Amino acid sequence: MSTLSRKQQTQKRHRRLRRHLSGTADRPRLAVFRSNSHIYAQVIDDAAQSTLCSASTLDKDLRTSLTATGSTCDASVAVGELVAKRALAKGIQQVVFDRGGNLYHGRVKALADAAREAGLQF
């Protein structure tokens, strides 16, 4: 019996999730990708295979406000607020949350809570 690495476990969970999650034009998918140092969020219309809006810790809007010594959860909150603001500006109010195989905890949960507080419904 082989053991999977943590990254392989995440990829396996993501494949399992994606079988059931898809975004439409009415209710696109809010996909979250978490790396060791950054977090990315995209609002995706899977039917048209297009990204409607996105935000990450590498955005010019956030890079200046986030400090290198700041908390990664604080950065996730800022990304969640920014992606929600951009989605609402495009008229998107409801999304399907795709945690990307990550556990709903920590940075992923902070991003989701911030997006909800900023006005996205999921």
Curated annotation (Swiss-Prot):
Ranges of Basic residues composition bias in the record: 9-21
GO terms under biological process: translation
Molecular function via GO: 5S rRNA binding; structural constituent of ribosome
Keyword Signal: no
Pfam annotation, one family: Ribosomal_L18p
Annotated coiled-coil segments of the chain: none
Entry annotated with the keyword Nucleotide-binding: no
Superkingdom of the organism of origin: Bacteria
Entry keyword set: Ribonucleoprotein, Ribosomal protein, RNA-binding, rRNA-binding
InterPro entries xrefs: Ribosomal_uL18_bac-type (IPR004389), Ribosomal_uL18_bac/euk (IPR005484)
PANTHER family associated with the record: 39S RIBOSOMAL PROTEIN L18, MITOCHONDRIAL, LARGE RIBOSOMAL SUBUNIT PROTEIN UL18M
Family from the record: Belongs to the universal ribosomal protein uL18 family.
Subunit description: Part of the 50S ribosomal subunit; part of the 5S rRNA/L5/L18/L25 subcomplex. Contacts the 5S and 23S rRNAs.
Biological role stated in the UniProt entry: This is one of the proteins that bind and probably mediate the attachment of the 5S RNA into the large ribosomal subunit, where it forms part of the central protuberance.
The protein's name: Large ribosomal subunit protein uL18
Source organism (scientific name): Synechococcus sp. (strain WH7803)
